[in-house]
């Protein structure tokens, strides 16, 4: 879809404006792969080593125990943890539905019945810690509201006498979860190794709502965000060893992430292990524990929407998981502006209209200058035709004569194009903001448009948009040959078909922009001398 938008914009801007510059009205009596990050020396580990006053008695590994679930219910989500591996079995978002309207059910980011494919499983083979170990926990189901906080603790002891404690901490009104892991060596000899958190993401097919247009691992390593498609890692695992800040798996609207706290992630590895699963391992720096010593490390976990403000609140530049492309610096303030106007209108469609009007007003001086320059060029067209005829056998002489003509009449031949080029980055930034905004997902506008992130179900707005393009085209008469005239006549039809399946929010922007352009062009044509 993005390629079609790029083509649409280029055609619209170049054809609608350049043609009026290149073919003025007749004068009277005048014939878009990231590769794996290179391995470099990792940052120092944040694991805190300390000696303990009394060594806890080593317990027998709990591999034979039956696993049980612990439910954490907050204002925003319902998470189900298992004592098997101390991992996450399911995660359900309360405020986001899979479908618009009353038929929608809560979005489920995780739901694994296979105990071997839970997320946040801990593994440290050198310490005798296997993901299949069943932890002990006295925690009970927990319900939190508002600013209430709580935690659940899991504990297991390996055959080597290493105790692993996992403590998850929650808040009733936040998506972020803190994970504290502590290793205690209760054995009689030193142990060395690293500990990993293992995540499994079940692969799903495209659902038709555009959610999986963007789908795959996202990693921030070496101060860069690397986005991989599932097809990329199907060719081979990706290893990241350079200052890993976070490792995530995301679709267009939602994501889960493990975020390093004080360099707690030394490396990350992403691999497609089967047709159904992608496995991500985030691993600590090497640890060395003498008898009686302990080490701890912390992580920030996130399971939730790709909302710009929510992600930014998590820290570690997690908001950069939203790919706004080259125009990120413009897209973010535009998106925040849309959200600002929504806070007053309570309708994202109206917010888009307001932003479109504001942009049109801001760019009016440039547009006015552009049309004025085109008018001046049109006045010189008869003399240019004479020069081309006079110097038709000497191109260099003709070019010099044309430039002298421009200089004499103080006309800039690029004056009609440059003001339009300035607006292109703003359009692409707004396109990105609308295209990847979770705020528009299932957001109604008026009447039949109940989801601005989906196509217009009755194709009304794309058709009206095509009509406005036709009117706009007719308001810019050009001196074209029959072939060019047919191309211009077909352009609104082509655009209409291209926009039939575009998100209604994006079509709404283009439609309002066309209507404002028609009004603006009528005013300019009336105000400028013929």
From Swiss-Prot:
InterPro entries xrefs: Membr_insert_YidC, Membr_insert_YidC_N, YidC/ALB3/OXA1/COX18, YidC/Oxa/ALB_C, YidC_ALB_C, YidC_periplasmic_sf
Entry annotated with the keyword Transport: yes
Residues annotated as transmembrane: 5-25, 348-368, 418-438, 492-512
Keywords for the protein's UniProt record, in alphabetical order: Cell inner membrane, Cell membrane, Chaperone, Membrane, Protein transport, Transmembrane, Transmembrane helix, Transport
GO molecular function: membrane insertase activity
Cellular localisation: Cell inner membrane
UniProt protein name: Membrane protein insertase YidC
Chief localisation class: membrane
Transmembrane helix listed as a keyword: yes
The protein's role, per its UniProt record: Required for the insertion and/or proper folding and/or complex formation of integral membrane proteins into the membrane. Involved in integration of membrane proteins that insert both dependently and independently of the Sec translocase complex, as well as at least some lipoproteins. Aids folding of multispanning membrane proteins.
Membrane-related topology note: Multi-pass membrane protein
A Pfam entry, by short name: 60KD_IMP
Any one of the GO CC terms: plasma membrane
Subunit description: Interacts with the Sec translocase complex via SecD. Specifically interacts with transmembrane segments of nascent integral membrane proteins during membrane integration.
GO terms classed as biological process: protein insertion into membrane; protein transport
Organism listed in the record: Geotalea daltonii (strain DSM 22248 / JCM 15807 / FRC-32)
Family: Belongs to the OXA1/ALB3/YidC family. Type 1 subfamily.
């Amino acid at each position: 879809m993005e390629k079609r938008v790029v083509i649409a914009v280029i055609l619209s801007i170049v054809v609608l404006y350049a043609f009026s510059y290149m073919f003025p009205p007749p004068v009277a009596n005048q014939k878009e792969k990231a590769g794996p990050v290179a391995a470099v020396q990792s940052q120092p580990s944040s694991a805190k080593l300390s000696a303990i006053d009394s060594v806890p008695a080593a317990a027998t590994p709990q591999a034979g125990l039956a696993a049980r679930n612990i439910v954490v219910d907050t204002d925003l989500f319902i998470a189900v943890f298992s004592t098997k591996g101390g991992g996450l079995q399911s995660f359900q978002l309360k405020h986001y539905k899979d479908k618009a309207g009353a038929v929608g059910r809560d979005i489920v980011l995780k739901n694994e019945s296979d105990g071997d494919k839970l997320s946040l499983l801990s593994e440290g083979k050198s310490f005798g810690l296997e993901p299949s170990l069943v932890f002990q926990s006295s925690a009970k189901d927990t319900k939190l509201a508002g600013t209430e906080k709580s935690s659940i603790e899991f504990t297991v002891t390996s055959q080597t006498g290493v105790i692993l404690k996992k403590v998850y901490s929650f808040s009733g009104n936040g998506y972020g979860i803190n994970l504290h892991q502590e290793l205690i060596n209760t054995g009689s000899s030193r142990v060395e190794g690293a500990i990993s958190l293992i995540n499994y993401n079940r692969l799903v097919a495209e659902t038709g709502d555009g959610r999986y247009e963007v789908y795959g691992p996202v990693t921030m390593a070496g101060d860069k965000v690397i986005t991989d498609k599932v097809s990329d890692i199907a060719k081979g695992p990706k290893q990241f060893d350079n200052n890993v800040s976070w490792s995530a798996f995301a679709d267009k609207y939602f994501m889960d992430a493990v975020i390093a706290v004080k360099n707690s992630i030394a490396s990350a590895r992403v691999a497609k292990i089967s047709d159904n699963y992608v496995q991500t391992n985030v691993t600590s720096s090497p640890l060395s524990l003498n008898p009686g010593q302990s080490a701890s490390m912390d992580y920030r976990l996130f399971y939730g929407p790709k909302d710009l403000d929510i992600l930014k609140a998590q820290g570690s530049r997690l908001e950069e998981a939203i790919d706004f492309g080259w125009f990120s610096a413009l897209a973010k303030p535009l998106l925040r502006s849309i959200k600002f106007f929504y806070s007053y209108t309570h309708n994202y469609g109206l917010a888009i209209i307001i932003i479109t009007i504001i942009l049109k007003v801001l760019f009016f001086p440039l547009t006015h200058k552009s049309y004025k320059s085109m008018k001046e060029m049109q006045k010189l067209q008869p003399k240019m035709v004479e020069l081309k005829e006079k110097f038709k056998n000497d191109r260099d002489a003709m070019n010099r004569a044309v430039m002298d003509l421009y200089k004499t009449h103080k006309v800039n031949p690029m004056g009609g194009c440059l003001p339009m080029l300035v607006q292109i980055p703003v359009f692409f930034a707004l396109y990105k903001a609308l295209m990847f905004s979770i705020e528009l997902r299932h957001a109604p506008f008026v009447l039949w448009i109940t989801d601005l992130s989906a196509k217009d179900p009755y194709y009304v707005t794309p058709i009206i948009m095509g009509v406005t393009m036709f009117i706009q085209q007719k308001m810019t008469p050009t001196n074209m040959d029959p072939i060019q005239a047919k191309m211009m006549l077909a352009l609104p039809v082509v655009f209409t078909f291209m926009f039939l399946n575009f998100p209604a929010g994006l079509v709404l922007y283009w439609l309002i922009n066309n209507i404002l352009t028609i009004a603006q062009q009528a005013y300019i044509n009336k105000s400028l001398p013929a």
